[in-house]
A protein has these predicted regions:
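Short, surface-exposed, charged amphipathic helix/loop patches that serve as local interaction elements
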Residues: 2-6, 12-96
Length: 96
């Protein structure tokens, strides 16, 4: 059975965002991750693609530490790819 339910990521109390986990978004994310040599710029682009520009701007205004931003990014990738946070974290920390 097909489901159009979108995963949600909760950043703080009252700050929840639906993750766009469509096939087209995943294709754009994969392309961005492969083509971009700047890891931070690629992470920003993924957040924009998966959560939308408004959510990205709200998150930017929070001035998260890099460690927290990485946690957010891994959570988004887990939601997009329908994997557990731990699986994505393991892959993210493994050099390619």
């Amino acid at each position: 059975k097909l489901s159009n339910d979108k995963p949600v990521i909760k950043i703080s109390e009252g700050k929840e965002y639906k993750i766009n986990n469509s096939k087209n978004t995943m294709l754009l994310i994969n392309q961005e991750m492969q083509n971009n040599k700047n890891e931070l710029a690629a992470m920003d682009k993924v957040v924009k693609l998966a959560l939308g520009q408004n959510a990205f701007q709200e998150i930017e205004s929070m001035e998260l530490s890099f460690a927290d931003y990485k946690v957010l990014f891994i959570g988004i990738m887990a939601g997009v790819s329908d994997q557990s946070y731990e699986e994505v974290e393991k892959n993210f920390n493994t050099p390619s």
